[in-house]
Amino acid sequence: MNCISDFFTYETTKSVVVKSWTIGIINRAVQLLIISYFVGWVFLHEKAYQVRDTAIESSVVTKVKGFGRYANRVMDVSDYVTPPQGTSVFVIITKMIVTENQMQGFCPENEEKYRCVSDSQCGPERFPGGGILTGRCVNYSSVLRTCEIQGWCPTEVDTVEMPIMMEAENFTIFIKNSIRFPLFNFEKGNLLPNLTDKDIKRCRFHPEKAPFCPILRVGDVVKFAGQDFAKLARTGGVLGIKIGWVCDLDKAWDQCIPKYSFTRLDGVSEKSSVSPGYNFRFAKYYKMENGSEYRTLLKAFGIRFDVLVYGNAGKFNIIPTIISSVAAFTSVGVGTVLCDIILLNFLKGADHYKARKFEEVTETTLKGTASTNPVFASDQATVEKQSTDSGAYSIGH
């Protein structure tokens, strides 16, 4: 029966006014901290009164300019930039290993790791290099025998050290970026209205002196990413050009501006001895008069640039404002919970506070006191006396 009677109970809030300097100061201090947090961080910093659009739409067009000298040849954009379409990802070639006049046929591998003594060492279990292994061990030179392959001959020798194209440090990259936030139908580009043709021809990006110039010097990008140009050009690498659009659309249109930052994206591979840097191969194909095909194979080392666009926009909306305001007012009640814990467990007179805060009333009690007024009877029997706890009042009988 006790379980049943305990189940069918009802609890209601009882207000007790405690006149204590200690608990009063704690209560107001906690409330002040909560209000300061919501006003300073939630509303002013995080702008919780705004609805945000993070689905940024972006297009990037790039153009590289500059001339360099490599292997006694003057190189222009068509020679050292790939792909040529001017996309958000492109490579500036800084070093090349060239293998000319390759034709289909049979020839020995030229690397020391394919050294052999007999045909049994050139079986299919051996990892192929420049072509398909034929299973024969043939003479590479008068002192070296290597496994024979079928493929493009002669095979590539990529262990030679080649110079880098130092002029690439002064090449320029023009970036044209257009963005749109579809939720607000807001569009803008990195070519700001105050930029003229004259400005674009002579300006160079600098984070402080020219933060909105769309023309970037390659050497500056490498430096801003914390890299050394000579080392990066020799091994190759991947750099990120980040364009951030974080816009408060409650402000003027011209306050939404791009912010550029730079980083190396393949930092992990840089530290690896297995495959450091960035390189790739491509070939140029030709035909002789008799119809035979031959090619020039190029192993290119270069700096790959990834233009990464990110951002979000916010604008005032009544719904998030109401939700954040309700959360702020509700959170103020946390101070009451903390003060109750201190009041009922740590202050002097805690037992008296508990007796006044928690009171159990049963039907038997109500029937026994029906002939009297319990409120006045309780008040007459109550004597207030001041405790020694910072002006707190406890209630005694």
From Swiss-Prot:
Q: Where does Ca(2+) bind?
A: 158
Q: Where in the cell is it found?
A: Cell membrane
GO BP annotations of the record are: behavioral response to formalin induced pain; behavioral response to pain; calcium ion transmembrane transport; cellular response to ATP; chemical synaptic transmission; establishment of localization in cell; inorganic cation transmembrane transport; modulation of chemical synaptic transmission
Q: In which tissues does this protein get expressed?
A: Selectively expressed in sensory ganglia.
So what does this thing catalyse? Ca(2+)(in) = Ca(2+)(out); Na(+)(in) = Na(+)(out)
Cite the entry's keywords alphabetically.
ATP-binding, Calcium, Cell membrane, Disulfide bond, Glycoprotein, Ion channel, Ion transport, Ligand-gated ion channel, Magnesium, Membrane, Metal-binding, Nucleotide-binding, Receptor, Transmembrane, Transmembrane helix, Transport
Bridged cysteine pairs (disulfide): 107-153, 116-137, 122-147, 203-213, 247-256
- Single GO MF annotation: metal ion binding
Q: Which residues are glycosylated?
A: 139, 170, 194, 290
Q: How is its activity regulated?
A: Has high sensitivity to ATP. Fast activation by external ATP. Exhibits rapid desensitization. Sensitives to the ATP agonist:alpha/beta-methylene-ATP. Subject to allosteric inhibition by AF-219. Mg(2+) and Ca(2+) slow deactivation of P2RX3.
Q: What is its main location?
A: membrane
This protein's GO CC annotations: axon; dendritic spine; hippocampal mossy fiber to CA3 synapse; neuron projection; neuronal cell body; plasma membrane; presynaptic membrane; receptor complex
Q: Which domain of life is it from?
A: Eukaryota
Its quaternary structure? Homotrimer. Forms heterotrimer with P2RX2. Heterotrimeric P2RX2/3 has a ligand dose-response profile that is distinct from either homotrimeric P2RX2 or P2RX3.
What does this protein's UniProt record list under function?
A: Extracellular ATP-activated non-selective cation channel. Plays particularly important role in sensory neurons where its activation is critical for gustatory, nociceptive responses, visceral reflexes and sensory hypersensitization.
UniProt lists the family membership as follows: Belongs to the P2X receptor family.
Extract the PANTHER family matched here.
P2X PURINOCEPTOR, P2X PURINOCEPTOR 3
Q: What is this protein called?
A: P2X purinoceptor 3
UniProt gene name: P2rx3
